[in-house]
Amino acid sequence: MAQELMFEEPRRGKPPRHLADFDAEGRASAVAALGLPPFRAKQLAHQYYGRLIADPRQMTDLPAAVRDQIAETMFPNLLTAAREVTCDAGQTRKTLWRATDGVTVESVLMRYPQRNTVCISSQAGCGMACPFCATGQGGLTRNLSTAEIVEQVRAAAAALRDEFGDRLSNVVFMGLGEPLANYARVLAAVRRITEPPPTGFGISARSVTVSTVGLAPAIRKLADERLGVTLALSLHAPDDELRDTLVPVNNRWKISEALEAAHYYAEVTGRRVSVEYALIREVNDQPWRADLLGKRLHGALGPLVHVNLIPLNPTPGSDWDASPKPVEREFVKRVRAQGVSCTVRDTRGREISAACGQLAAEGG
């Protein structure tokens, strides 16, 4: 049975507040409420964002007498690793996280020769109901808090440092959920990720990607924030007739509206927009659709667009599969012939259901 679109999360209790939920002013207020001197706020932020420590009992520059109090009030254990699985010779690791209310989400850490990327979740489940995506088939449980999002990043950065002596370079909001449907918390998380220590992790905004199925008003709103992050538009079809089915939000905002919003984003930020296109055998891989995709993107975005073709990854309950390689190559050639940059994405994590469209946070 097809899922219905859900833009509002079901009513649920909120996760406990955490240091990562607060901006600088909020941290100062939280520290003052504990009766601590103002400089402790910056100290705590430095420990968390700079040293990647999430347990005040390990913060040796804090008086021992206040560590337990700070742990209880500002550092609740929001996410517990319930399961980890790896593939690609240990270069890809998927973690199933369990939140304080029992909901589960997933993140995927991918190590490459020149970069280290973590794919993070912004919601538990997803309300966008895309039929080829495991997350969309499961529906929306709730939004994640800012701190629950940020904690996925801190955990990945700490793992890279402690296990490999390496640094986290890239963050992509491509895990569970539609990031722009959880706008305020995702925006706050992006700020924590990109601001320099001691107020954030200091990851370049150009190395942070926020994906969306095409919530046009929110794309424009994000452009006006002028954060400079990369926008990834999950398009998957160049014509409204097919996209209405593949990406049901298209019934609310048509392709032309999504592309106009993407053009606005590129114009305001100067950043090239990434267009994601899952190639599905005999569904959206026809030559004429490749031609139309190239024409529409070139007309809307000119040189400020790049197409990432994604070979469809298998998901439970779906009979669709990836297009054959010759069809894939022809599709790339035709899109490029329209003057649009196009490549096939390197797929990681398929064996452990960690690839694009496979995350569902099941089990544990």
From Swiss-Prot:
Cellular component GO terms held in the UniProt record: cytoplasm
Compartment(s) where it occurs, according to its Swiss-Prot or TrEMBL record: Cytoplasm
Group of enzyme by EC: transferase
Active site: E106 (proton acceptor), C356 (s-methylcysteine intermediate)
UniProtKB keywords: 4Fe-4S, Cytoplasm, Disulfide bond, Iron, Iron-sulfur, Metal-binding, Methyltransferase, rRNA processing, S-adenosyl-L-methionine, Transferase, tRNA processing
Sites where the protein binds S-adenosyl-L-methionine: G177, E178, S211, S234, L235, H236, N313
Domain Radical SAM core: 112-350
E.C. numbers: 2.1.1.192
Chain positions recorded as [4Fe-4S] cluster binding sites: C126, C130, C133
Disulfide bond entries: C119-C356
Alphabetical list of InterPro entries matching this protein: Aldolase_TIM, Methyltransferase_A, RNA_MTrfase_RlmN, rRNA_lsu_MTrfase_RlmN/Cfr, rSAM
Pfam families named in the record: Radical_SAM (PF04055)
SUPFAM superfamilies xref list: Radical SAM enzymes
Primary location class: cytoplasm
Co-factor binding comment: Binds 1 [4Fe-4S] cluster. The cluster is coordinated with 3 cysteines and an exchangeable S-adenosyl-L-methionine.
Molecular function in Gene Ontology: 4 iron, 4 sulfur cluster binding; metal ion binding; rRNA (adenine(2503)-C2-)-methyltransferase activity; rRNA binding; tRNA (adenine(37)-C2)-methyltransferase activity; tRNA binding
Catalytic reaction list: adenosine(2503) in 23S rRNA + 2 reduced [2Fe-2S]-[ferredoxin] + 2 S-adenosyl-L-methionine = 2-methyladenosine(2503) in 23S rRNA + 5'-deoxyadenosine + L-methionine + 2 oxidized [2Fe-2S]-[ferredoxin] + S-adenosyl-L-homocysteine; adenosine(37) in tRNA + 2 reduced [2Fe-2S]-[ferredoxin] + 2 S-adenosyl-L-methionine = 2-methyladenosine(37) in tRNA + 5'-deoxyadenosine + L-methionine + 2 oxidized [2Fe-2S]-[ferredoxin] + S-adenosyl-L-homocysteine
GO biological process: one example: rRNA base methylation
Known cofactor(s): [4Fe-4S] cluster
PROSITE patterns (UniProt xref): RADICAL_SAM (PS51918)
Misc remark: Reaction proceeds by a ping-pong mechanism involving intermediate methylation of a conserved cysteine residue.
Family membership: Belongs to the radical SAM superfamily. RlmN family.
Biological role: Specifically methylates position 2 of adenine 2503 in 23S rRNA and position 2 of adenine 37 in tRNAs.
Name the UniProt record assigns to this protein: Probable dual-specificity RNA methyltransferase RlmN
Gene transcribed to yield this protein: rlmN
